[in-house]
Amino acid sequence: MDKIVFLEPVFCERIWGGRNLESFNFDIPEGNIGEAWVVAAHDNGSSKIVNGELAGLTLKEAYSENPQLFTEKKYDKYPLLIKILDASDNLSVQVHPEDDYARVNENGELGKTECWYVLDAKEDSKLIYGHTAKTKEEFDAAIDNEEWDKLFVEEGVQKGDFFYIPAGTLHAIGEGILIYEVQQNSDTTYRVYDYDRVDKDGNKRELHIKKTKDVTKVPFKKVATTREVENKEGATITYLADERYFAVYKLDVSGKVTLEKNKTGNLFTVLEGSGVVRVGGDSFDVKKGDSFILTIACDTFELEGSMFLIGSYDK
C-alpha cells in the first residue's frame, strides 16, 4: 500500500492568467494559464498519480476505488482541491455558495470555503475581501445600481499574507498576486462584476446576479486568523488555519526534521527550495512545484533540505 503519492497538476487557461506558473518548474501549455490544480479530484479536472502502485490513475479514480487510503472519514467525493493561481489581471468579483445551496442548485456540488496564502504580490497589490452593506436590501440595491466602488472592500496585500474565505464571502484576487489556495472540492463560482471585459471571442463572461444575492452573507464579518508557531530542530511550523473543512500549516525546513502525519491524509506542495522526503525507508527528491499526498498508510515522515512547503488536511 502506497504511503506517498506524487501528483501531476492540471492547468487551466483563464482570461486573467499569465505565465508565472512556469516559475514552479511546470511545463505549462500555451496561453494565459491562470490555475494549476496541484491536488485535484474533480469532474472538471483531476491530478494524475505518477508513482507507485497507483501510477497512471487520476486522483479521482484512485479515491473512488480506495477512499480509505486517502481520508479517515468517508466522503462521497475527495474533500479538498488545491490550486496555485497566477492573477496577472484582476479576477472577477465573486462569491461561492455553502454546501446546502450548492447541493440543491448545482447538481449535488459541494459548497466552497477556501483560504489563500500569498506567495508573491507586486507593490501596491490589492484584493477585494467583503462588502460594506449592512442589510440585504442595501446589498441588493448596490448591485442593481452598480455602485461597485461603494460596495466592495479593498485590502492591501503582500507576500506572506493569509486569508480565510468562508462560503458566502464576496471576494476577488487582484492583479499581480500569486496565491496558494486550499478549498473544498468545488468548482462553483458566482460572478457579480467582471470589469466589463470580453474574452478572445469578444464575449463578456456570464454574471450570476440572483445567485450572488442569494448566497452572500450580509453584513460582512471578517474572520480573523491567528498564527501559532512551533519551532523544531530543522524546521519551523506555522499553523495558519484550523477550520470546519480543513487545517493548513506552513513548513520552513532548514535541515532535517521528523514529523508525525495527521491521522487523515496530508497534502503538501513545495513552494520554494528543494530537499528530500523520506517515508517508510524510501527517499524521494522534491523541488519547487512538487505536490504529494501522505496516505493513511503513513505514520511518520522525514523532511530534509532547504525548502518551504504548505501542508493541509481535511477535517
Sequence positions of predicted segments:
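Short acidic-glycine-tyrosine-enriched beta hairpin
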Residues: 151-164, 178, 279-298
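Transition-metal
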Residues: 1-134, 194-223, 248
